[in-house]
Amino acid sequence: MSAAAYMDFVAAQCLVSISNRAAVPEHGGAPEAERLRLPEREVTKEHGDPGDTWKDYCTLVTIAKSLLDLNKYRPIQTPSVCSDSLESPDEDIGSDSDVTTESGSSPSHSPEERQDSGSAPSPLSLLHSGVASKGKHASEKRHKCPYSGCGKVYGKSSHLKAHYRVHTGERPFPCTWPDCLKKFSRSDELTRHYRTHTGEKQFRCPLCEKRFMRSDHLTKHARRHTVFHPSMIKRSKKALACPL
């Protein structure tokens, strides 16, 4: 027997021996590998005849191949699950998979959660987020003018009421200055008009000494200064509202 054949013979003997120890019958039934086990006396006997040695070698190799084929079809045992790891019915009811929004879609995760999970957002989730943002933007301006042919929409009902007076011609804010019969549809228009009688100019330029009756006139003037910034007017308004 050559060296390579002898090594195969020894490996086959080891494989058969391991299979005989591992194949413990369950429920009293002998597995198929038990039927293919070679008797101990045939494995351990001295091989004086070369023909017998070659025969035993071929038998062991055949059994080893059969055992390898059986291992391919051996069912994988599922690991036992402890009772502590089972989810309770309450946890199952409160899982995220059962929660749906009013539109019928699953709640979207925050960008931090998507970044931690390492998965890119799906196109469907991006579509839902886009629809939600559009719906939020539309809800900000939900007061539509009911007048025929006018499609203007406002975020506040008071702004809509003031605009609707343009269609009806209503002017509920009359000027109280003596001999002045003007009326206005908005209170801010009346306030600006009233300053024409009093000469009040409460809007002062923060970069010079000029004053104006209207804030838009002040802004238009202040932009002519090279060092002007819109925050300057905001600070001047706060100082005027809260004098020291």
From Swiss-Prot:
Matching SMART domains: ZnF_C2H2
Presence of the UniProt keyword Metal-binding in the record: yes
Annotated Basic residues bias: 134-143
Residue numbers spanned by region Disordered: 26-51, 79-143
Biased composition annotated in UniProt, kind: Basic and acidic residues: 32-51
Record-linked InterPro entries: Znf_C2H2_sf, Znf_C2H2_type
GO MF annotations in UniProt: DNA binding; DNA-binding transcription activator activity, RNA polymerase II-specific; DNA-binding transcription factor activity; RNA polymerase II transcription regulatory region sequence-specific DNA binding; zinc ion binding
Record-level GO BP terms: cellular response to cortisol stimulus; embryo implantation; negative regulation of keratinocyte proliferation; positive regulation of transcription by RNA polymerase II; progesterone receptor signaling pathway; regulation of DNA-templated transcription; rhythmic process
UniProt GO cellular component terms: nucleus
Subcellular location: Nucleus
Pfam families associated with the record: zf-C2H2
Modified residues (Phosphoserine): 122
Keywords (A to Z) from UniProt: Biological rhythms, DNA-binding, Metal-binding, Nucleus, Phosphoprotein, Repeat, Transcription, Transcription regulation, Zinc, Zinc-finger
Gene3D superfamilies: Classic Zinc Finger
UniProt cross-references to SUPFAM superfamilies, sorted A to Z: beta-beta-alpha zinc fingers
Assembly and interaction partners: Interacts with ZZEF1.
Function according to Swiss-Prot or TrEMBL: Transcription factor that binds to GC box promoter elements. Selectively activates mRNA synthesis from genes containing tandem repeats of GC boxes but represses genes with a single GC box. Acts as an epidermal circadian transcription factor regulating keratinocyte proliferation.
Family note: Belongs to the Sp1 C2H2-type zinc-finger protein family.
Protein name: Krueppel-like factor 9
Organism from which the protein derives: Mus musculus
Gene: Klf9
